Amino acid sequence: MRILGIDPGTMVVGYGVIEAADDELSLIGFSSLTPPASAPIPQRLAYIYKGLVEVIELYQPDEVAVESPFADKNIKSALAIGKAQAVALLAAANHSLSVTEYSPACIKSRVSGSGTASKEQIQEMVRLLLNLAEIPQPNDAADALAVAICHHSHRAFANITSQGD
């Protein structure tokens, strides 16, 4: 199964694609989309949408996983991220792809075993789980790979628990 993970944002959108075959994970590709910082939000969202459509058409994922915005103290930031998240959902839906959303705490827990893991710990786990020499850069792409790994872990656990029925 090929999984596209997306770390949404209006300044940078990270994406990462993994292939999951049994318990083996392999890296297919990763990068980020960086719309012009001076562009108004609608133009940045259009740039993100077009870029994600190109990513979907290039990598042909089976499923998409997207990080949900975290609204703690900065509601304005969470709302902006939510707009980028909606664009990611739309790009996937327009390609008839199944999309699952995950909270930051769920991603941390699935990737590292701790919902309170640091960004550095998550990035190191991504490196280890994908058997890479270095942590993927930019950070947004490493975060997107963590989203994809989380989705694989979630699906694997769901398959195990459903076999007992």
Curated annotation (Swiss-Prot):
InterPro entries noted in UniProt: RNaseH-like_sf, RNaseH_sf, X-over_junc_endoDNase_Mg_BS, X-over_junc_endoDNase_RuvC
* Protein name from the UniProt record: Crossover junction endodeoxyribonuclease RuvC
What is this enzyme's catalytic activity, as reactions? Endonucleolytic cleavage at a junction such as a reciprocal single-stranded crossover between two homologous DNA duplexes (Holliday junction)
Q: How does it assemble?
A: Homodimer which binds Holliday junction (HJ) DNA. The HJ becomes 2-fold symmetrical on binding to RuvC with unstacked arms; it has a different conformation from HJ DNA in complex with RuvA. In the full resolvosome a probable DNA-RuvA(4)-RuvB(12)-RuvC(2) complex forms which resolves the HJ.
- EC number(s) in its UniProt entry? 3.1.21.10
- Provide the residue positions that the database annotates as binding Mg(2+) 1: 7, 140
Which residues are involved in binding Mg(2+) 2? 67
In its UniProt entry, the species of origin is given as: Dehalococcoides mccartyi (strain ATCC BAA-2266 / KCTC 15142 / 195)
The entry's active site is 7, 67, 140
- Listed GO MF terms: crossover junction DNA endonuclease activity; DNA binding; magnesium ion binding
The upper taxonomy is:
Bacteria, Bacillati, Chloroflexota, Dehalococcoidia, Dehalococcoidales
Query: What is its subcellular localisation?
Result: Cytoplasm
> What cofactor does this one take?
Mg(2+)
Q: What does this protein do?
A: The RuvA-RuvB-RuvC complex processes Holliday junction (HJ) DNA during genetic recombination and DNA repair. Endonuclease that resolves HJ intermediates. Cleaves cruciform DNA by making single-stranded nicks across the HJ at symmetrical positions within the homologous arms, yielding a 5'-phosphate and a 3'-hydroxyl group; requires a central core of homology in the junction. The consensus cleavage sequence is 5'-(A/T)TT(C/G)-3'. Cleavage occurs on the 3'-side of the TT dinucleotide at the point of strand exchange.
Gene Ontology terms, cellular component aspect?
cytoplasm; Holliday junction resolvase complex
Note on how the cofactor is bound: Binds 2 Mg(2+) ion per subunit.
Name the GO terms of the biological process aspect: DNA recombination; DNA repair
Q: Which UniProt keywords apply?
A: Cytoplasm, DNA damage, DNA recombination, DNA repair, DNA-binding, Endonuclease, Hydrolase, Magnesium, Metal-binding, Nuclease
